[in-house]
Amino acid sequence: MFLRRVHPVRLGHAIQRSLTTTKSRNESTTTTVEAPQAVPSPPPDAFTEEFLRNQIKVTELQRVILGVGSSLAALVNPRRHDMIACLGETTGVPALDAIRRQMLASDEGRQILADRPRINTRTVDMAALKALPETSFGHQYVHFLEKHDITPDSRAEVRFMDDPELAYVMTRYREVHDLVHTVLGMPTNMLGEVAVKWVEALNTGLPMCYGGAVFGAFRLRPK
């Protein structure tokens, strides 16, 4: 007797209105989630394109074999620049990564990694450097190249590395090698190379540089 009797028709209408309201509320709160569109990656820069053309992918086992074989070949014949280059690439990743972190810590280093400048006859006006005063670094650099009949275009391409940015760091190291010779006033004979390798080893931490500095010294003979 406490419940008021409800007319069946009115009860049906009330239930229908309730269901309609609930459905509308659910539809209003349901949002359509669209799949994120893939952002196209920027095209590779000129250095990365060149590196990918020359790259030779190797497994870790192959990397170890190349490292051991190239080190032995370089010991037997220090003039095997191809073996020295292979040794540097297969053993130098930790040191190159440390160099990259150090470069990223400065504005100048970040700019170099972003622009990836090269040092060769296509990017540097050697004639303009030669025309500089004799006491200038640019003039002395060209004088060193001409005196020893070498060219910055002779540096080997990086092949046995995976990371293009680390490959650039290795390329940068190779292209400034003759600049170090110029600063130190060292020739390209065994004594000069050993001296340069010690400076490079202490500044880069590359195992190949330490190997060249230590084992190269054993090949020096008194005159």
Swiss-Prot record:
The keyword Lyase is assigned to this record: yes
Protein localization: Mitochondrion inner membrane
Binding site for Zn(2+): H177, D178, H181, E193
Biological process annotations from GO: ubiquinone biosynthetic process
Catalytic activity: a 4-hydroxy-3-methoxy-5-(all-trans-polyprenyl)benzoate + H(+) = a 2-methoxy-6-(all-trans-polyprenyl)phenol + CO2
Keywords from the named record: Lyase, Membrane, Metal-binding, Mitochondrion, Mitochondrion inner membrane, Transit peptide, Ubiquinone biosynthesis, Zinc
Transit peptide: 1-26
One Pfam assignment: Coq4
Region (Disordered): 21-43
Stored InterPro entries: Coq4 (IPR007715), Coq4_euk (IPR027540)
Intrachain S-S bonds: none
Biased composition (Low complexity): 21-32
Protein family according to the UniProt entry: Belongs to the COQ4 family.
Principal location: mitochondrion
CC terms in the record's Gene Ontology section: extrinsic component of mitochondrial inner membrane
Subunit structure: Component of a multi-subunit COQ enzyme complex.
Known EC number: 4.1.1.130
The protein's name in its UniProt record: Ubiquinone biosynthesis protein COQ4 homolog 2, mitochondrial
